[in-house]
A protein has these predicted regions:
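Beta-strand segments within the central parallel beta-sheet cores of soluble alpha/beta enzyme folds
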Residues: 80-90
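Divalent metal-dependent phosphate-bond-processing catalytic cores, especially two-metal-ion Mg2+/Mn2+ enzymes
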Residues: 7-14, 18-39, 44, 48, ...
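Non-catalytic interface/linker regions that flank or bridge core catalytic/transmembrane domains
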Residues: 1-7
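Amphipathic alpha-helical scaffolding segments
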Residues: 1, 62-63
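Alpha-helical segment that forms one wall of the substrate-binding/catalytic cleft
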Residues: 64-68
């Protein structure tokens, strides 16, 4: 029930992670459906993506990715599910950061994103869905800002989808 240090978050961290998870579905952005194992990994990533957020931690995604495999292995999840969830937690900010902070039309940027996801199109689909769910669960939306940090908007959807498409083409 910790408040977030980021002013973009309206909800406490635990409430935000539940909000994110509630927005995840079986439909992939590429038009398919997640099988049970991929969907399970996506839901697990949703409920734990901000688990690394705590005082004095500079990179909460890396910190979370350090804890996730330990937790999920202890809970008895299959190695693939653990690996996918770990990658998603580690990279849950990457798609949005690349779309807004780099040139999404630069082939080297698309290749870097593809490399981070092991050239796995299903992981890219899952990352897109996690990114969209995370961005739309912040509390700030288009036209509403909290200290000038925006949540999910049509503009953000468009540029993130462009980065997603470029990375998919690089795979």
């Amino acid at each position: 029930n910790r408040p977030s240090a980021s002013a973009a978050h309206r909800y406490t961290i635990d409430r935000h992670m539940v909000e994110v998870t509630s927005r995840l579905g079986r439909e992939t952005p590429s038009g398919g459906r997640y099988d049970d194992d991929h969907f399970k990994a996506l839901l697990l990533a949703g409920i734990t993506h901000d688990i690394g957020k705590r005082a004095f931690v500079a990179d909460h995604a890396a910190e979370g990715a350090r804890h996730v495999p330990v937790i999920f292995k202890r809970m008895g999840y299959a190695p693939d599910i653990v690996d996918w969830a770990t990658v998603l937690v580690r990279e849950h900010l990457t798609l949005s950061e690349f779309a807004t902070g780099k040139d999404p039309y630069d082939p080297a940027v698309a290749e870097e994103l593809a490399d981070r996801l092991h050239h796995d199109k299903m992981l890219l689909d899952m990352l897109f869905d996690l990114t969209r769910a995370d961005g739309s669960s912040l509390g700030a939306t288009a036209g509403e800002t909290i200290t000038k940090q925006y949540g999910w908007s049509k503009w953000r959807e468009q540029i993130v989808r462009g980065m997603y498409s470029a990375a998919r083409a690089a795979m």
